[in-house]
């Protein structure tokens, strides 16, 4: 059954004019249904030029002398070049580039005092000062034994090591 709308005053043009702003007109330049799909960027356009690279912030004053001499050479080789003629300082780096992979490699000596301080500093950043105190108390005996080269037992709670190849035939 078809719907019929009866108009009270009989003038259909006036009723259409009152609702006309709610409909799109045919004479508008912008046609929503016939728009072309968005074009991808041209292959020659360099997308990285659109992003701004912010400079690396300076480290806090407490981080100034944490790099050992072998690590310093690696850090300088990874450092961005300053084109203004200013010299580069290792203190400008907030952290050694490469993270733990570089620190654990042959480049950085794990027995170096500055390397151990760097580990303690990172531990303080993530776990608080109580964890760093535990780390210092654990590292001190090990470093003393390494430097002396003696075979003194380090702690009572450490189990004795068993030989890897046990040839017991019982």
Swiss-Prot record:
Name of the molecule in the record: Protein B-Myc
**Residue intervals passing through the bilayer:** none
Q: Which residues carry this modification: Phosphoserine?
A: 60, 68
Described purpose of this protein according to its UniProt entry: Seems to act as an inhibitor of cellular proliferation.
> Where can this protein be found?
Nucleus
For the keyword tRNA-binding, the answer is no
For this UniProt record, the keywords arranged alphabetically read as follows: Nucleus, Phosphoprotein
Output the Gene Ontology cellular-component terms: nucleus; spindle
Effect recorded for residue 60 to A: Loss of phosphorylation
Q: Name one GO molecular function term.
A: molecular adaptor activity
């Amino acid at each position: 059954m078809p719907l019929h709308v009866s108009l009270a005053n009989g003038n259909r043009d006036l009723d259409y004019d009152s609702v006309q702003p709610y409909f799109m007109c045919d004479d508008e330049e912008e046609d929503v249904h016939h728009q072309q799909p968005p074009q991808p960027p041209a292959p020659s356009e360099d997308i990285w030029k659109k992003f701004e690279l912010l400079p690396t912030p300076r480290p806090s004053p407490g981080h100034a002398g944490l790099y050992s001499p072998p690590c310093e050479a690696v850090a300088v080789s990874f450092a961005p070049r300053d084109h203004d003629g200013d010299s580069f300082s290792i203190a400008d780096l907030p952290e050694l580039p490469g993270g733990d992979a570089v620190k654990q490699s042959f480049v950085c000596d794990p027995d170096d005092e500055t390397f151990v301080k760097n580990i303690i500093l990172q531990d303080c950043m993530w776990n608080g000062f109580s964890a760093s105190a535990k780390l210092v108390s654990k590292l001190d005996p090990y470093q003393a034994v390494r430097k002396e080269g003696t075979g003194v037992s380090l702690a009572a709670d450490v189990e004795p090591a068993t030989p890897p190849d046990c040839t017991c035939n019982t």
